[in-house]
Amino acid sequence: MADKNSNEKLLYCSFCGKSQHEVQRLIAGPQVFICNECVELCNDIIREELEKGTGGEVIGGASADHPLPTPQEIRADLDQYIIGQDFAKKTLSVAVYNHYKRLYNKGGKDDVELAKSNILLIGPTGSGKTLLAQSLARLLDVPFVIADATTLTEAGYVGEDVEHIIQKLLQKCDYDVDKAQRGIVYIDEIDKISRKSENPSITRDVSGEGVQQALLKLIEGTVASVPPQGGRKHPNQEFIQVDTTNILFICGGAFDGLDKIIRQRSEKGGIGFGAEVSSKDDGKSLTKLFQEVEPQDIIRFGLIPELIGRLPVVATLEELDEEALVSILTQPKNALIKQYQKLFSLETVELEVRPSALRVIAKQALARKTGARGLRSILERALLDTMYELPSMQDVEKVVVDEKVIEKGDKPLFIYREGGGVAQSA
């Protein structure tokens, strides 16, 4: 090999001193050179600084140019999409802000380590639990995935094991591990995996308490082994390692029957003159009862104490009344009526839904006990024939929906462009 004293003019890295024959690539600058090994070393140094939060790391969609939104800003954004639920929105805003602030300050010089605060959402069906989680993920621009707790089983049994949740999260961000490790996971129907009784069962409960046990480490923070590109696990396979420590887990459920447990606890009184007297039927609504929930109530319902301990932030959602459902139909940024009006506008037709019709839709949703989730099915059924016939019709300018269309299934009012003609049917 030639050296510095030979006739051959060798080029050397200005940083490490290696010759062009000792490295794969030498990059030239103005009177200086750098080898590929030094470039890789520089990249490693910069990457380590970013992970410590000293170099403007992007966390949760925030950066030096786009700082993490404050709790009030998070709440204001949620207000655009979700009606009511003030307590839940405030609780979530603070919890999410603190979670991503914790990631910003990770690797600080002091010894204080900030623990993760996962969230438990308790509220009736159709009250907005899933929408809250989706809206948060959209605002923060982080990967988001919804997992159904009822499909989960213990590892080794038929069904999806808990690590499949992380696999879905990876798929959402094209297997970018760093991005996935800052994501949000919403586990729906968490109440459906409650154990069958308060006492430990002799028989194995693979889809109830077994799943709760499997979720413990995942929620608290562990390194999950995920098959690459969505494949199944098999021996001699390389796995993708995902650290769940910084993933925010939000669990939600309707918890049907929890109100009875809370009422039983609150009605228990002492004996004698000093006992607190309480009425057996104090007329408390589901909303007020849920606001009084204690960890012991959720444990009695069937979630294990260890899981409750890993979900320290509890946010309860209110029952939606008629006024709230009417507002949901019209006020949010992506309100249901606005969606259908947009759909009709693609046919150059204006859609008008009269206030009386909105009231009937809200009343029917209340009667079905489906909350906001039932609004779309009611409106879809009422407009099905119209949406079927409208693309084939000529010169329709406006479609008007009143209460009879919703209640009795009557045809909407059609207003035509030419001559201002009016037709009652298609």
From Swiss-Prot:
Residues given in the record as Zn(2+) binding sites = C13, C16, C35, C38
SMART domains this protein is in? AAA (SM00382), ClpB_D2-small (SM01086), zf-C4_ClpX (SM00994)
Which positions are annotated as binding ATP? P124, T125, G126, S127, G128, K129, T130, L131
Note the superkingdom of the native organism.
Bacteria
InterPro entries found in the cross-reference section: AAA+_ATPase, ATP-dep_Clp_protease_ClpX, ATPase_AAA_core, Clp_ATPase_C, Clp_protease_ATP-bd_su_ClpX, ClpX_bact, P-loop_NTPase, Znf_CppX_C4
Molecular function terms from GO: ATP binding; ATP hydrolysis activity; ATP-dependent protein folding chaperone; protein dimerization activity; unfolded protein binding; zinc ion binding
One matching Pfam family is zf-C4_ClpX
The entry's cellular-component GO terms read:
HslUV protease complex
Q: Which UniProt keywords apply?
A: ATP-binding, Chaperone, Metal-binding, Nucleotide-binding, Zinc
Where would I find the ClpX-type ZB domain in this sequence? 1-54
| Gene Ontology biological process | cell division; proteolysis involved in protein catabolic process
The task this protein performs is described as: ATP-dependent specificity component of the Clp protease. It directs the protease to specific substrates. Can perform chaperone functions in the absence of ClpP.
Q: How does it assemble?
A: Component of the ClpX-ClpP complex. Forms a hexameric ring that, in the presence of ATP, binds to fourteen ClpP subunits assembled into a disk-like structure with a central cavity, resembling the structure of eukaryotic proteasomes.
Which NCBIfam families is this protein grouped with?
Answer: clpX, PRK05342.1
Q: Which HAMAP family match?
A: ClpX
Q: What is stated as this protein's family in its record?
A: Belongs to the ClpX chaperone family.
What is the protein name for this chain?
Answer: ATP-dependent Clp protease ATP-binding subunit ClpX
Which organism does this record belong to?
Chromobacterium violaceum (strain ATCC 12472 / DSM 30191 / JCM 1249 / CCUG 213 / NBRC 12614 / NCIMB 9131 / NCTC 9757 / MK)
